[in-house]
């Protein structure tokens, strides 16, 4: 949550390690996903067309942030990137077993952020 009362809340006594940065990026991703959920709930809860439009736009920007952070995480932790790719492949194989075509639905190595309409 916001800590505006403390002007030094963002100051840190040292640079973080790569491992700490990876953990921080994961936490950032969780925060972005939570923001997407909240903004989407607001969109669904109002009939005001201006509010719906603005909130949906903000929600979609958060989706792009997830994509940016996922890309950064994959850069910082190539092993984790391989596991993400393995998971994507497993789902593709399941879809094939169910005779569901994925051709033309997504680009290879897509992320949540890359699925946002441009």
Model-derived features: positions:
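Iron-associated oxidoreductase/ferritin-like identity signal
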Residues: 1-118
